[in-house]
Amino acid sequence: MKLAFIIDPIHQLDPCHDTSVALMEAAQILGHEVWVTQANWLSVVDSKAWAILQQVELVPVQLIDGRWVAASPWYTLNTRSFSSLETMDAVFMRTDPPVNDAYLYATYVLDYVDQRKTLVINNPNGIRGANEKMYALQFTKAIPETIVSADKDFIRQFVEAKGATVLKPLGNKAGEGILFLQAGDRNFNSIVELSTQQGRLPVMVQTYLPEAKEGDKRIILLNGEPIGALNRLASGSDFRNNMATGGTVAKTEITPREEEICSQIAANLRQDGLIFVGIDVIGGYLTEVNVTSPTGIREIDRLDGTRLAHQVIQWVEKNLQIQN
């Protein structure tokens, strides 16, 4: 197979952490061609999606003394070519958020890939319809008490009723802009005004879950089925458990309650073409559904001795065989 990965500039990626690199390595190890491009290298020509593509050869990371070690250099890029994305068997959309205009325009370009010829993971229309904070709201039995609003007075009422809450911007990633907000906070007005841009943008406010102190679980789903998980723990005084904010990771198991959550959302994910997804769970409650560029494979493989990226590529192989 020929697989294309739409990524951030490859020199910016950390091969010891980045899930996109893990997927590319797995594809190469399994005998497939790996090509890379970027969101700003996409075009539409004669109503078809094209891209500046470069074939890449990778030196896979090695697990030494419990940590991933990368060669230097860890990749080699070949000459650029301008080609139709339909020359690829599958295209992985792996550009990191925020989901801004540039990101959305890239998904519109991907609409012009004929998915009868080339599988796009995740489906561009599915990505657009699945805000990573808002998507979870349809699963009312799985989520904590939540509001979404730009109205400061309504937010205040909710916070005063719940006592302790977490405020989340709707378009950020990796814990950016997430704030702990409680009744009586002297900075309440400033926090809400800044987060909502003076009442112009809605934010999500959720009941604070004390179980967050025990970790925030990331569960990786492949076509709606859980294939691995890790627990993320906050560092120091920061209440956020994200790896990007300095949090640490620990081995974990998927509980029956978490299996139930996965079952609740599986049909929706499949219907929306959201094949590779990471969900976040705290204390048995679904808090986010990550569909743009979910991460965690490197850490799960290191902790559990698994090869999750291989499972993903093998799923693509099997799916394309069935399709053809």
UniProtKB/Swiss-Prot annotation:
Keywords: ATP-binding, Glutathione biosynthesis, Ligase, Magnesium, Manganese, Metal-binding, Nucleotide-binding. GO terms for cellular component: cytoplasm. Mg(2+) binds at residues 288, 290. Binds 1 Mg(2+) or Mn(2+) ion per subunit. Its EC number is 6.3.2.3. GO terms for molecular function: ATP binding; glutathione synthase activity; metal ion binding. Pfam families: GSH-S_ATP (PF02955), GSH-S_N (PF02951). Its cofactor is Mg(2+); Mn(2+). InterPro entries: ATP-grasp, ATP_grasp_subdomain_1, Glut_synth_pro, GSHS_ATP-bd, GSHS_N, PreATP-grasp_dom_sf. Residues 133-317 form the ATP-grasp domain. Pathway: Sulfur metabolism; glutathione biosynthesis; glutathione from L-cysteine and L-glutamate: step 2/2. It comes from the Bacteria. ATP binds at residues 159-215. It is an enzyme of class 6 (ligase). It catalyses: gamma-L-glutamyl-L-cysteine + glycine + ATP = glutathione + ADP + phosphate + H(+). Gene3D superfamilies: 3.40.50.20, ATP-grasp fold, A domain, ATP-grasp fold, B domain. Belongs to the prokaryotic GSH synthase family. This is Glutathione synthetase. It comes from Nostoc sp. (strain PCC 7120 / SAG 25.82 / UTEX 2576).
